[in-house]
Amino acid sequence: MPNENAEDLSGQELKQKAKEVADASEAMLEKVVAGLNIQDTASTNAAGNEDAEQPDGAKNEASVSANASKQALLQAVSDAMASTRQMAKKFAFWSTQPVTKLDEQVTTNECIEPNKEISEIRALPYTLPGGFKWVTLDLNDANDLKELYTLLNENYVEDDDAMFRFDYQPEFLKWSLQPPGWKRDWHVGVRVEKSGKLVGFISAIPSKLKSYDKVLKVVDINFLCVHKKLRSKRVAPVLIREITRRVNLTGIFQAAYTAGVVLPTPVATCRYWHRSLNPKKLVDVRFSHLARNMTMQRTMKLYKLPDQPKTKGYRRITAKDMDKAHKLLEDYLKRFQLSPVFSKEEFRHWFTPKEGIIDCFVVADEKGNITDLTSYYCLPSSVMHHPVHKTVRAAYSFYNVSTKTPWLDLMNDALISARNVQMDVYNALDLMENKKYFAPLKFGAGDGNLQYYLYNWRCPSMQPEEIALILM
């Protein structure tokens, strides 16, 4: 009897081979090809020994099948070699930067390059390709802010299928780019000289970061964006060099950043999880799909939440709570290997509720002590090519602390709070202690990973549950 799983198993093997090949260097690829030739010869010899026992039709069928498998695998090798060349070109820039190498085994927690004297740092901006000029954006200027919003809205991160794109609202940009200590000089833009059109941007904000047992003065790098039509101009590497130069001139030589792609070299890789709050809309826009044997009515019932939070003492944070809540979070973050160190002023900035931007709730006991905290920021995504829905309103889990209220109760209340301000989905990374509530609260694993990186700092890699850093 024929094996019903033979075709599927073959496909899995091909995918596995292709993945192995894609991860290898070109030298290794040549070995793989050589190995294929050896295996092919061995297969031919084995087939020759069995020829006498097989009818001609079976021989021909086996030959066609073997050739098809060989061609498919050779195509996978060819595609992987092309991918490897592209990756090598992409990594050429990073090979010039103080970052850990992909094959480097790190056991220390230290800077890669020593800090420089200000006199050693390049005084003039880096040279842009012809036809472009540097600008420093003023986010308090309505025109500059609108231009930045438009650039990001039309050219920033979108999903692989080009169905959704982050829609950072102007007031969100001001909140995320103007924390305590922000510098206008770190809001770096690129314009076309003739038209003045904004076609590139990168930003930095000051921060303190704990890496294992050391606290670093760093910047968080974000919103690196180049207009789609200019991505062959190699503008992005110049933007990175220029923001590095400007930050170095202030005496800061380390940075943290995240990316959905793999670069040299992630400190950690986290995965997004999603909890439907408005399942009908999410299915309509193809953000999610109905599970097998599930109707829309059953799906809506599955994700239905109570009308109001249930935890006694659960309420939105107030100005009077700030110092106690700051101490609660400060103590909690010390448990993790990579975490921010917030000053009181920074805590007030990041956790004071702003409608449509950030929301924060605490649980207070009878004596007024703050025992628990939950927070999320609001980041809609534009829906591309849908006749009805133009936006998916997403809540992103920020920082959460549970000391008295069970995790499931606290986060269920957070879901209710987000649903009550018309959020469609609640997203969370599998860092800190978030995994504890994913399954019970009906979160589903997403297909996107987020890599964490440190610039000019090497340290041993970390598991997601050792990470307590959220970058927008």
UniProtKB/Swiss-Prot annotation:
GO biological process, one term: dorsal closure
Membrane topology: Peripheral membrane protein
Record: residues binding tetradecanoyl-CoA: 93-94, 223-226, 232, 234-236
Location(s) in or outside the cell: Membrane
Traits of the deletion mutant: Mutant embryos show disrupted actin cytoskeleton and abnormal cell morphology. The range of phenotypes includes head involution failure, dorsal closure, and germ-band retraction, as well as widespread ectopic apoptosis.
Catalysed reactions listed for this entry: N-terminal glycyl-[protein] + tetradecanoyl-CoA = N-tetradecanoylglycyl-[protein] + CoA + H(+)
Record-linked PROSITE patterns: NMT_1, NMT_2
Region feature (Disordered): 1-23, 43-65
Keywords: Acyltransferase, Membrane, Transferase
Keyword Membrane appears in the UniProt entry: yes
EC number annotated for this UniProt entry: 2.3.1.97
GO terms assigned for molecular function: glycylpeptide N-tetradecanoyltransferase activity
Primary enzyme class: transferase
InterPro entries xref list: Acyl_CoA_acyltransferase (IPR016181), NMT (IPR000903), NMT_C (IPR022677), NMT_CS (IPR022678), NMT_N (IPR022676)
GO cellular component, one term: membrane
Function, as annotated: Adds a myristoyl group (tetradecanoyl group) to the N-terminal glycine residue of certain cellular proteins. Such protein modification are critical for the developmental processes that involve cell shape changes and movement.
The family this protein is said to belong to: Belongs to the NMT family.
The protein, known as: Glycylpeptide N-tetradecanoyltransferase
